[in-house]
Regions:
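Conserved hydrolase catalytic core segment
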Residues: 100-143
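Conserved HGGG/HGGXW glycine-rich cap/lid loop of the alpha/beta-hydrolase fold
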Residues: 14-75, 79
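N-terminal cap/lid segment of alpha/beta-hydrolase-fold proteins
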Residues: 2-19
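Alpha-helical elements of Rossmann-like donor-binding domains used by nucleotide-donor carbohydrate transfer enzymes
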Residues: 8, 85-92, 112, 116, ...
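Alpha/beta-hydrolase
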Residues: 160-181
Length: 181
């Protein structure tokens, strides 16, 4: 795996609320279906999905940053933080890049977007790959609580105290959260 992105094309695309950044890497002339990679967050960037660039030897791989993330505009408008807008963002990306057929990879929150997009039965979606998607907030909260309950009691105490005192930015809390993750 190379350590450089080597985008063949990158730019911004207009979408509801601002401009989103994209970068395309790989073989644009490949007969294999182009892959769109959707990052988690919301608020993270595409950069941690770098290992997917290994697929660029055989197909076009498109990375993008959702609005308010990475290299995209950051209007910081809570009206933008809704699933239908994120779905339109994905449609805008496909239209702007003229992607008639695609495979979609979604990780975490990106998996939520990808699953919702797939459920709308969009034309040309050939493959869907979900990695640790959030498909049920209720189940996610229960899983997180179960994981937290299994931490050492001293870490649970630190986290509870810091949360009650609104000290989530403290180093003590951050150290406890690092163990959680």
């Amino acid at each position: 795996m190379s350590t450089e992105w080597n985008f063949k094309e990158q730019g911004t695309i207009d979408t509801d609320g601002g401009k989103i950044w994209f970068g395309a890497i790989g073989n644009q002339d490949s007969a294999k279906t182009p892959l769109i990679a959707i990052h988690g967050g919301p608020g993270m960037s595409h950069s941690y999905l770098y290992p997917l660039s290994d697929l660029a030897d055989e197909r076009l791989v498109i990375f993008y940053d959702q609005l308010d993330a990475g290299r995209s505009d950051r209007p910081n408008n809570s009206q933008n933080w809704n699933l239908p807008r994120f779905l339109r963002e994905l449609d805008d990306l496909r239209k702007a890049l003229d992607l008639h057929r695609v495979a979609i990879f979604g990780n975490s929150w990106g998996g939520t977007i990808a699953a919702a997009y797939a459920s709308s039965n969009p034309k040309g979606l050939e493959r869907l790959i979900l990695s640790s998607p959030l498909l049920s907030t209720e189940l996610w909260l229960a899983d997180n609580q179960s994981h937290r309950d299994n931490l050492p009691s001293e870490l649970i105490s630190v986290m509870q105290r810091c949360e009650e005192e609104s000290q989530e930015a403290s180093q003590e809390y951050q150290d406890a959260v690092d163990v959680f993750y």
